[in-house]
Each structure stands twice: as C-alpha cells, then as structure tokens.
C-alpha cells in the first residue's frame, strides 16, 4: 500500500504516521497458534508439542502443514483412532495432545528427516478459507489475520490524511505464545494510548449464549473487562477516556458498537498497558465464532465497520484530548 515500515529484532512490523497530540499505538498480532515437532518415531509418525491454546477436543483428524521451507512444506493429518476399533468408553473421551501423532504418509524416520522435518519444526493447521453466504469467511487463523486486514485498511486511509494524532500501526508477534511480543515495541514507542485489535467471542450459538451478547454481523465490539483466570493473573479494564471515545465515535458514525465482558480471554494489551507510567488502553475487535479451532468464522461487514470506527475515533484525538480520569467520572 506504499507505506514505509520497519521491523524490530523480535519480528514486530510497525509503520509510523506523524501527527500532533497523544501518541497512539494501534496494533494486532499476526502470529498464529499451532504446534512444534517434539519427536519423530522410528516408524515416521510425528509427536507434537502444543504452541498456544489449541483445543484438544478438536484436533483428531485435522489436516496440518509442517513448515520446513518455502515450497517444501509437508502435509499431514493428526491421526484419529479407527472407529471400528474404538471402545464404547473411548468414544466419549478426548485424547490428550501428547498422545496424538501426525501421519505424513512417510514410512520411517529417515524419510521424515529427508523431507526436511526436524525436532523444533513448526506445525500449523492446513491453511484454508471458504466464503459462507455472501459476507462471511470461515477458515484458519481468522484470529488474527482478520485484524491484520482491518489495520491494513486503516493504514491505507492514514497515508492520505492531513491531520490527527501520531499513530504507530503495528503487526506483532508472539501473542499466541506468551502475549509479550508487543511489549518491547511498546517500550520503544512509549505510547500515550494503546488500542489493540483481536477477536471478540461471539455468543450467538447455543453453546455460547450464556456468555454474553456479542452477535456475528452485529458490528464491532469493545471489551469492558477481560481476565484470564487460568494461571495468568492478568487482564484489561479499559481507560474511561477510551470507552468514551469509542462510544462517541460510534454514535457519530451511526455504527453499532457491541460490548464484551469475559473471563478466559487475554490479549497482549494486558502487558502493553503497564509500560512507562501506564498507557490509556482498550481492546477493540470483531465477533468471531469457534476460536482457536481449525475453522474460525467472522463477518466481513463487522470488519468494515471496525475499520470505519477506528478511523473515526482517531479523528477525534487532538492535541487537547484528555487522558485525565477525573474528566470522565
């Protein structure tokens, strides 16, 4: 899109758009969850270690891609025990990932190694995407390639603007691994405001309806509360200036803005918010179904509206924009 960018030693990619007022870091992660090759058996079957929060109950019989180099990646399938040999008890059990293995069709360890597969090789869900109806996309790594698509459209618009705050648009790494890839970049940029883009758990399916009111196709979402609660005592409660900003921008642009409050959800913003003397922060995003599975689902209209909302909000941040909490009580 003709925008100058740079990368840091971790692999974060950032583009700076100069301006006046509070400095804004607008970011989303570009990495994806997956696996690492842990062991190659004598018979050529491959054992995996988990990289990120992969759902074990959705792994058996999934197509995967073992990443060994451009044009040389090896396809495989996570094996599923033959149904005819499955006991009545096993039919209702989830096999732990450590007991699963990948079958590449290669017949021995020597053939696997000759294909370039080594311990430590990355393994991902086999990339795929399909249009459902006219306006929905189902595929791998919608989390957070959809967020990347939104930021590309925002960057395309910022390239031609004539006013507004200084904005650093960043595509970050290591979010699915340890949530800290964005941290060194934030320490370098020292933003006043941080806006993070990621999925919002859609709650419009029977298994999720008790979790909230986030509807696919209902517009972008704003998180009012997130807390991991699974060993990582971290989360984000947004700065009141950010809540006020996005509510005003949504009203002005007639964009429906959905609200989320979830336990079990965590983003890298939870660490970015603690940089320096503290950063005024908010998690924004798009509704998505079936998170961390091989097929995630989002609505294109939500992505378009999210890009429009971000641009509208940035347009309201001027040199006198207040981050004083007393102004929002």
Regions found by a protein language model. Give the residues of each.
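N-terminal hydrophobic/helix-forming segments and targeting peptides
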Residues: 1-329
